[in-house]
Amino acid sequence: MRERPRLGEDSSLISLFLQVVAFLAMVMGTHTYSHWPSCCPSKGQDTSEELLRWSTVPVPPLEPARPNRHPESCRASEDGPLNSRAISPWRYELDRDLNRLPQDLYHARCLCPHCVSLQTGSHMDPRGNSELLYHNQTVFYRRPCHGEKGTHKGYCLERRLYRVSLACVCVRPRVMG
């Protein structure tokens, strides 16, 4: 028979849930501008070069953490950023493409295959799996514009959706059968 969570544990879960929701609302609410012209002036003009350097996605701080090679050593920190305190801790990896706007996107990578126990903060609980949470981010890819007689006149911005992993979440395992 399972014990009911104590008031302190329950409020910790609610607090963690609210922090994750706030983080996701912040990141998902920062879409790129969709009203840019489809073809920009030539590369020599300042405005196009400024656009290529401008990123509309908030840049999370890079963590020095590396993926845990030993799953039994997965831990949830007591302080620090949300990604290290979560019961499904993650780190960020840079994805840079110089022909994409924004050029820099950060992808979450789960540090543990299972969730960290809320009771100990250090041992993994096999009743929960750490899985990535994704968002489709609007990005623009730079493509050459064709001028008169096949000459290149600047470049065009091609709008696409790009799948970005935002965070890791603790989920119940799927039951096949």
UniProtKB/Swiss-Prot annotation:
Primary location class: secreted
Give the compositionally biased regions (Basic and acidic residues).
Answer: 69-78
Q: Which InterPro entries does the annotation name? A: Cystine-knot_cytokine, IL-17_fam
Compartment annotation: Secreted
Q: Which cysteines are joined by disulfide bonds?
A: C110-C168, C115-C170
Signal peptide boundaries: 1-32
Q: Where is this region: Disordered?
A: 58-81
For this protein, the record's SUPFAM superfamilies field holds:
Cystine-knot cytokines
Q: Which UniProt keywords apply?
A: Cytokine, Disulfide bond, Glycoprotein, Secreted, Signal
Which Gene Ontology molecular function entries are recorded, alphabetically?
A: cytokine activity; interleukin-17E receptor binding
Q: Which Gene3D superfamilies match?
A: Cystine-knot cytokines (2.10.90.10)
Q: Name one GO cellular component term.
A: extracellular region
Glycosites: N136
Lineage, top-rank taxon, reads Eukaryota
- Tissue-wise expression: Expressed at low levels in several tissues, including brain, kidney, lung, prostate, testis, spinal cord, adrenal gland, and trachea.
Per the UniProt entry, what is one GO biological process? inflammatory response to antigenic stimulus
Query: Family, per the entry?
Result: Belongs to the IL-17 family.
Q: What does this protein do?
A: Cytokine produced by various cells such as eosinophils, T-helper type 2 (Th2) cells or epithelial cells that plays a role in internal safety of adaptive immune responses by regulating cytokine production. Promotes and augments T-helper type 2 responses locally or systemically. Exerts its activity via its receptor composed of IL17RA and IL17RB for signal transduction. In turn, stimulates the JAK2-STAT5A pathway and promotes the secretion of type-2 associated cytokines including IL4, IL9 and IL13.
Please state what the protein is called: Interleukin-25
- Native organism is Homo sapiens (Human)
Ranked from the top, the taxonomy reads:
Eukaryota, Metazoa, Chordata, Craniata, Vertebrata
